[in-house]
Amino acid sequence: MSDNEGEQFFDIPKNALDRVEARTMCPREDGKVVRKQAPLKEEPRLEAEQKRSPKKQEKPRGMLPLEQLVLKYVVVVCSLDALREFGGLIAQIRQSHQADMTRHLEAVATEHRANLQALTKSQQEHEKVSKEILSAVISIRSNLNENSSPRHKPLDLDQVNAERALGFGVGYRTALNVFGKLRGITPEEAGSQEVKNMAIREAEEDEYEGSRSFFKKVLDMVKKTMR
């Protein structure tokens, strides 16, 4: 084998030795490749111990939850003082909660009473309005029934008195006119038909400011009486 053939045969890449030494775990003299240390065998044992379930602590029987909680975190010597302080704190919290709840309930009750009073007042107003509406409906219905009735409405008392006063005034004026024209006529001639007709004409010709239909009825009654 020539020198060239030997060089070609032993022409090894630079990193080949590194790979070989890494596989054989043999460090080089120049210290470029560090030997890996094998993992400790104690770690699996520690992990196994950690995975073991701890022993359950037996709870003392016949004790309140607060006592058990205090004994869990406080030394037995100080447990009585801790229980006393915790009990007082819980009592204060309970009293404060009860006071807040009482104030809240009183505020709610006051609000409910105010709402109830407002509702009662509103109902009374609605009842009043309903009564007024019902009264108006009854009045309208009564007026409609009276207007649709064929019977004539009776005259009002004041209206009747006014008509009588006007009739008396007309009759008085007529009597004065007739008396003025009958001067010089004897009582025997006063009852004659001619005198009666003259009185009727004076009554018909007199001016009357009232109802003509009412005056006509009165005049017809006078004619019937005098004839």
Curated annotation (Swiss-Prot):
PTM comment: Phosphorylated by host kinases.
Keywords: Chaperone, Host cytoplasm, Phosphoprotein, Viral RNA replication, Virion
Any Gene Ontology CC annotation: virion component
Compartments (UniProt record): Virion; Host cytoplasm
Region (Disordered): 24-60
The keyword Cytoplasm appears for this protein: no
Ribonucleoprotein recorded as keyword: no
Record-linked Pfam families: Rhabdo_M1
Protein purpose: Non catalytic polymerase cofactor and regulatory protein that plays a role in viral transcription and replication. Stabilizes the RNA polymerase L to the N-RNA template and binds the soluble protein N, preventing it from encapsidating non-genomic RNA.
Protein name: Phosphoprotein
Species in which this protein is naturally found: Hirame rhabdovirus (strain Korea/CA 9703/1997) (HIRRV)
GN (gene name): P
